[in-house]
Amino acid sequence: MKTDTAYYVFDLGRVRERIAYLRQLLGTEVSLAYAVKANTFIIEGMIPYVQRLEVCSPGEAAICERLGVPPEKMVISGVYKTPSFIERSVISAPGRIYTVESLTQFDLLRGSCPKSTPSTDSNPVRALQKADCTT
């Protein structure tokens, strides 16, 4: 096939083989995550094979939401977390997992937690809110 436009071909079968290989080496106690920024076009193909999708920007989160990725399957990571993005994420999906890159991000996350929700260890956001990082 001749074309004037560059294109990429991804073999999801090979990707699944690689995931199976990693699973064999690491066992089931290790969770695997797919970094959405690597290639947003294969997200749907990755969902059944990894435990989490690492999302590092509001744009990546929007893509995952449009594709119907369950919020509990996303890890909100990276340094680019605006206050409005964190607040919207916490309100729309209180069970999401977050990485915190700084005390500023921790304070933003803790400040976005609903005050009326009972604390439980099963809700990572609430567990973070219980931590005392002021001393």
Task: Kindly give the residue locations of the regions a language model identified.
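Short, structured patches in soluble enzyme cores that scaffold and shape functional sites
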Residues: 102, 122-124
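Active-site loop/helix belt of alpha/beta enzymes
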Residues: 112-115, 124-135
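A charged N-terminal "starter" segment
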Residues: 1-116
